[in-house]
């Protein structure tokens, strides 16, 4: 299965049919991180991160570390999924 997010010059293309519920997906577009996930009710949720420190960490990290960085950010900002 391919990654359900792709970045194009016009924006982010999302393929919700490829998303697993409660799984976090991310991409970087226009120097912002977008965190997108589909909840158990099939509703898409999106968060935009503009903090340069987090963006720099994500750009410099591998996949496993990116997930940890984003999970820590979500917890710190109290964006926990319901």
Name these PLM-found stretches.
Residues 16-61:
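Acidic, low-complexity, intrinsically disordered interaction modules
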Residues 49-82:
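Mixed-charge, Lys/Arg-enriched low-complexity segments
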Residues 1-25:
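Negatively charged, low-complexity tracts enriched in Asp/Glu with abundant Ser/Thr
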Residues 3, 8-10, 45, 62-65, ...:
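Generic short amphipathic/hydrophobic targeting helices enriched at N-termini
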């Amino acid at each position: 299965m391919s990654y359900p997010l792709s970045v194009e010059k016009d924006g982010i293309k999302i393929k919700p049919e490829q998303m697993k519920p409660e799984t976090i997906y991310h991409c970087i577009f226009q120097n912002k991180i977008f965190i997108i996930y589909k909840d158990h009710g099939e509703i898409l949720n999106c968060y935009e991160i503009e903090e340069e420190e987090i963006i720099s960490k994500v750009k410099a990290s591998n996949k496993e570390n990116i997930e940890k960085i984003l999970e820590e950010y979500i917890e710190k900002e109290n964006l926990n999924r319901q």
